[in-house]
Amino acid sequence: MAKRRFGIFNFKIDKYGPVYNLIRGVWEQRVARLGIYILIGIIIFSIIGIFYTPYNPNYTGFPRDLPPSPQHLLGTDDYGHDVFSQLLVGGFPVIGVGFAVGLIGTLISILVGITAGLYAETILDRVLSAITQIFLIIPGILIIELIGAYLGAIQFKLGYTVVLFALASTGWAWGSRVMRSLVLSLRRREYILSSELIGESKIGTIFRQIIPNNLPFIASNFFFTAIYGITGFTFIYYFGLGSLTQVNWGTMLYWSLGGEAYLRGLWWWYIPPGFMIGLVAFSFALINIGIDRVANPRLRVWDIKKYKKQLQKAKEKKEVVTNG
């Protein structure tokens, strides 16, 4: 089967297409596989919490501040909740919002970045670039915290849907900025100019040329934005800006802070949710490293050394067989 190089990232195109090649390239990275395994384990853990928990996570009738035991694997908190049950239930909102923020934020960054790049040096580009610059200068989480503090003053707490769209609407600026730069670079390439000369529309150029050539960046931007969504979600509930009646890892940290768990030595109350949040972000970061290695050949030094060692072993094995 004939194969050709694919765009600026030198992917080989076969019958499976660029998406398959990206997935295959990422899967071949050991660090990315580790991140995928960790993420799958956390997702399974969170899905189990939807259908099963040892106890009702909202039940407060247990003895308070019990250390971990066979009856309560992670003990109980200062309010009589079973910590392990809350940990099970609290994972799905965090991961779900993180993925949703990553998806929506990436779509916004693609739309704004490609539009600004295709219409560079126009009024539309200047307006979009100015808006992007504002969101780059002012941290999105700070904006959400200010809005949440104002709404809290009027007794309104942020729900999951509001938090999701608030994070997505403030987490797209970095990706948009980079996407615009990539589009400007691609516009000067010969195959893009050739497609324009033969009459291909801008929509066709976007879906047939620009997006396929930027798949690694789009995937990387998704995980980067998802990390922002998870950390932003946690901060919002940790500072009490969200609805505190909802059980998630952020509210667990909020109540542990209010109960002075650290000062009282109740480590089982705050370490498990903090560890799980860090583990999710760590898995996303590992996958992102794998994507970067696929997209940037300069980061494949470790792989080159590995393949050289394998080649040397194969040569030595061949010499042994020949001499034998």
Question: What label would you give each PLM region?
Answer:
Residues 92-106, 203-234:
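Transmembrane alpha-helices
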Residues 2-58, 128-131, 135, 204, ...:
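N-terminal signal-anchor/first transmembrane alpha helix
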Residues 23, 47-85:
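Short membrane-interfacial helix/loop motifs at transmembrane-helix boundaries
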Residues 136, 149, 224-225, 232-271, ...:
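Glycine-rich helix-loop "coupling/hinge" segments at transmembrane-helix boundaries
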Residues 76-81, 119, 194-204, 208-213:
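Short helix-to-coil transition segments within interhelical loops
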Residues 83-116, 280:
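Transmembrane alpha-helix signature in integral membrane proteins
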Residues 155, 170, 223, 266-324:
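C-terminal transmembrane helix and the adjacent membrane-cytosol boundary/short C-terminal tail
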Residues 73, 77, 83, 104, ...:
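Generic hydrophobic transmembrane alpha-helix motif, especially the helices
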